[in-house]
Amino acid sequence: MTHFNKGPSYGLSAEVKNKIASKYDHQAEEDLRNWIEEVTGMSIGPNFQLGLKDGIILCELINKLQPGSVKKVNESSLNWPQLENIGNFIKAIQAYGMKPHDIFEANDLFENGNMTQVQTTLVALAGLAKTKGFHTTIDIGVKYAEKQTRRFDEGKLKAGQSVIGLQMGTNKCASQAGMTAYGTRRHLYDPKMQTDKPFDQTTISLQMGTNKGASQAGMLAPGTRRDIYDQKLTLQPVDNSTISLQMGTNKVASQKGMSVYGLGRQVYDPKYCAAPTEPVIHNGSQGTGTNGSEISDSDYQAEYPDEYHGEYQDDYPRDYQYSDQGIDY
């Protein structure tokens, strides 16, 4: 008997193969072994894959479930007849009602490529047989639900149009009923209620909110001059020193009295300091007045003639002479 030569897997192929092998269910294999042996009456052997590899037991299985599905079963030990048996089994279970996505490929079983998919196919076949009424002592597979078609008359169909299902939600909670489109004018009353319009424009309905909280009433556009009194109330301010609460406060530090950069600053406040009666002379020839101006000698002489002598008097005699003879410096 010839065999296919296939080397070991490496890299991604080995990783995929190991991942598939990790999903293999050994308990399901034991249940499938017992079920197949009970249905066919044939022994699979200790190795599940080698026992089903030739396809003979599989063809006998589908013939028990659906007699006459496989006309000829090849019992040769060659590879091609064994692959033909597996192919005939796959065609037979498709005709039996198996879904294409539940069926394995021939190489998955023959080359031990994906025994997990082989196991899945046999479990689905057991469930399909149970659905069709083929029962055994081995409980394996899931019975498929049968289609139940119901027909309703026109009266029941129309009555169901007014019923809101649970999947549609509920209409007992808050909704957007009565909301207008963006930018549309909103009325202060409900026209559908056929009620009269409000007496004035100050009537605010509950849908419009409340006017008891903070609002932007009286706020001006940026850069617009703000008055310190209400023009709508025709009230005149008492004086220009009245500052409303919206204008801030004048009880803290400010830049009032600050001069332009580079100008001289006065050392007194004319509102609180009285003018001095006598000038203050710093250099003897010039002085500084109360307002920071300089006082010349002529001004001082005109104001105080008795105290001004014009020039300094020399009280020391000039009849002596200095002599440095005989003195070495």
From Swiss-Prot:
Record SMART domains:
CH
Q: In which tissues is it expressed?
A: Expressed in both non-smooth muscle tissues as well as smooth muscle tissues.
Q: Which domain of life is it from?
A: Eukaryota
Q: Could you tell me which residues the Calponin-like repeats occupy? A: 164-189, 204-229, 243-268
Q: Name one GO cellular component term.
A: cytosol
- Offer an example of a GO molecular function term for this protein: cadherin binding involved in cell-cell adhesion
Q: Name one GO biological process term.
A: actomyosin structure organization
- Residue positions, PTM N6-methyllysine: K158
The record places domain Calponin-homology (CH) at: 26-130
UniProt xrefs under InterPro entries: Calponin-like, Calponin/LIMCH1, Calponin_repeat, CH_dom, CH_dom_sf, SM22_calponin
UniProt keywords (A-Z) are: Acetylation, Actin-binding, Calmodulin-binding, Methylation, Phosphoprotein, Repeat
Q: Where is this region: Disordered?
A: 279-329
Q: Which residues carry this modification: Phosphoserine?
A: S323
Residues with N6-acetyllysine modification: K23
Query: Any keyword Transmembrane helix?
Result: no
Q: Where is the composition biased (Basic and acidic residues)?
A: 306-318
Q: What does this protein do?
A: Thin filament-associated protein that is implicated in the regulation and modulation of smooth muscle contraction. It is capable of binding to actin, calmodulin and tropomyosin. The interaction of calponin with actin inhibits the actomyosin Mg-ATPase activity.
Instruction: Tell me the PANTHER family matching this sequence.
Output: CALPONIN (PTHR47385), MUSCLE-SPECIFIC PROTEIN 20 (PTHR47385:SF24)
The record's comment on protein family reads: Belongs to the calponin family.
Its name, as the record gives it, is: Calponin-3
What is this organism's lineage? Answer: Eukaryota, Metazoa, Chordata, Craniata, Vertebrata
